[in-house]
């Protein structure tokens, strides 16, 4: 196995994450060790992720997945695992063809772990999901990033406002962003950044350039 570009980093006794890579492009993968299941937030696209997950899950627990959105770097390994359940948005389901569609907030208790899975309005990808763990960490995938439109990175102004409103209700103080180092950014900094972008909107313009 060549996983020299991958690291498994521990956040606390229950939660770890696998670092992202550029070649192949692969998102961060979050691993939550519940009482009955191991939970994966995104499954990545790097071929060595499966072996790292197997090592993490030495007890052989069933595995559930929560997919942030449908881009390949987040779901590329979906067929490499035998999941008990897969939670995703409607557009992601069109790409995976397996699991459940989540369109409203759900709360799950798995031993000492409490998960909050919820739809996240996002310019980057419609139908995104986020996952909050123990009101401590909130995993956002690429949810706060811009989208590509006519060769420019832009935000949909309406979706951005909705996203800010949703993120303000999250109790966790630590927001975790894929492809970003450090992985953790304080909630207040993320929201301040998004509010600054929203503040640049022009009247009657649907999109805001990401400068």
List PLM regions with ranges.
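Metallo-beta-lactamase
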Residues: 38-40, 114-116, 121-200, 205-207
